[in-house]
């Protein structure tokens, strides 16, 4: 139940307030004030993230290792993700994997990074959606990030959160531009809404270049939409296409540092990411 409130504002503040009204996500002054108060009273950024670290092992230099443990300049690629979360003040991290031994051994002294890491073990491969499903008991009532563990990136996650709140989204997907798109989840966007999502399209699309970066911000309401199956259930082929069709999947387009491990050409990809990490993360990460 809402109550009427009368307030007096300076003219300059009122002009700034009116500038946020777009008639769609912010309908009027009352709505603008309510939304800004919501943003001010909530945490500046979610403090929890789920890292999806499952999938089959990969062969690297004669050894079978989990993909998140592939070394980039002497550090597992998942280490870059954890450090980027810490840089964004996200310190409660849940890692979901079918094999956590090597990962947990590496992060045995996570206190040195200033984070708390919990582990959820898949008894069988669950897929990206299934992995979140088995971790939902650790998520609480606040928004949370979910991301892949095979990318190097540098992003202001607070900006993602601010847009997520402003659009009243249940799910926000970070998008990046790529020239070659057939290896990724390809999106079409109208305004901020994702209107179409196709995972790894068979035919290269020369018109659409926005792809899924594997970084998501979810409200707890998403947990009622995900499912666990007898076979792996994927965000990319199950949840996201449905949400795009329903018009409830939002996007955040990102133009900063982002590079993904390419399993089709692993050795060259490691070389490329080593260069990206050396040149792009000079000031931390």
Regions found by a protein language model. Name each.
Residues 2-6, 11-51, 56-59, 63-64, ...:
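Conserved N-terminal catalytic core of the sugar/cofactor nucleotidyltransferase
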Residues 112-114, 166, 189, 246:
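Short, well-ordered coil/turn elements that cap or connect secondary structure elements
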Residues 69, 187-189, 251:
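A structural signal for short hydrophobic beta-strand segments in well-ordered beta-sheet cores
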Residues 167-177:
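A short, conserved acidic/glycine-rich loop-to-beta-strand motif
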Residues 78, 135, 150, 164, ...:
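Residue-level signal for inorganic ion chemistry
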Residues 43, 87, 138-141, 154, ...:
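Alpha-helix termination/capping residues and helix-transition junctions
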Residues 22, 26-31, 145, 152, ...:
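Catalytic-core segments of class I nucleotidyltransferases/pyrophosphorylases
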Residues 184-195:
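Acceptor/aglycone-binding surface of glycosyltransferases and processive sugar-polymer synthases
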